[in-house]
Amino acid sequence: MLFRSHLNRNKRSVALDLKHADGMEALRRLIAKADVMVWNVRPAAMARLGLSYDDVKKINPKIIYCGLYGFGQDGRYKDKPAYDTIIQGASGMAALHHRSTGEPRYVPMVVADKVVGMTAVQMIVMALYRREKTGEGSSIGIPMFENMVKFVLEEHMYLTTFDPPLGGTGDPRLLDPQTKPIPTKDGYICISANTNAQAFGMFDAIDRPELKTDPRLVSVQARFANVSYYLEVRNAAFASKTTAEWLKLLEAHDVPAMPYHTLESVQEDPHLQDAGFFLTKDHPTEGKIREMRLPNVWSCGTRKEWSAAPKLGQQSVEILREAGFDDAAITRMIADGATIDGQLKR
């Protein structure tokens, strides 16, 4: 899958058959030297392999043991398998599209996988900091279902936040079908005018200053209570000029706005070009590929050159050597199927 070339750079790959004694021994040696162990199968499978937290901490008491799995272990779904689209549907995320358009739909990206992965990173950093202070390792569980339910309902639990509920679910501003890129003379534009200054600036930009005294639009609270009317007025105003003309006019009134990009046009965005965001690199096996620079910056160092995403088992031999296996043992493991050498052509 092509996305792995973006996600797996600067990593090394060792492939082990954990049902083979030598493969399991290799993993145990790696665990003994590791700071963090991340796994993403059902917890019962880890227990069957002899890799539960109790098993692993006997090998390395200070390890951070992080499991990403479908469902929390206190409920009836605990043994169910899970994938991104299953979790999107079960968490209520697909229902957001249903509310807006009348038809449920998955977000066309692996958003649940990404959110849960980022959550895991946060938890691992917290656990490493705790270990720095206490000297103790820990076990972390990251259930996809519960994390995505929380992710969705932070905005959309809405008035059912109260007990008893004061109304229904779903933020009406976000779920209104008019909350979308706005058509212009030659395309679309994206606008967010939330504060009074921004909304009034937009009214001036569209040459509708009288809207500033419309009781339905005069304040943040009024626009919230009349969100459909506000969006209708806003969206109807932009067909008369091009996107570029509107961007210039809105910027003059300090109204937050950006062009609508396609997946193709965003790669030509001038700001990203200024920042050198996209890079072309020579991949060791795939020829020239385009990559994205790490966008975040920090004061303690500079961005480093990256190594290409590895093939499965590409560094098996070097990693097994580091784990203490000699070349004869590694050759035997390859022949027996306990590992694979991704450097070999097949």
For each feature predicted by the language model, list its residue ranges.
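A glycine-rich dinucleotide-binding beta-alpha-beta segment and adjacent secondary-structure elements
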Residues: 252-306
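Short, small-residue-biased leader/transition segments that mark boundaries at the very start
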Residues: 1-2
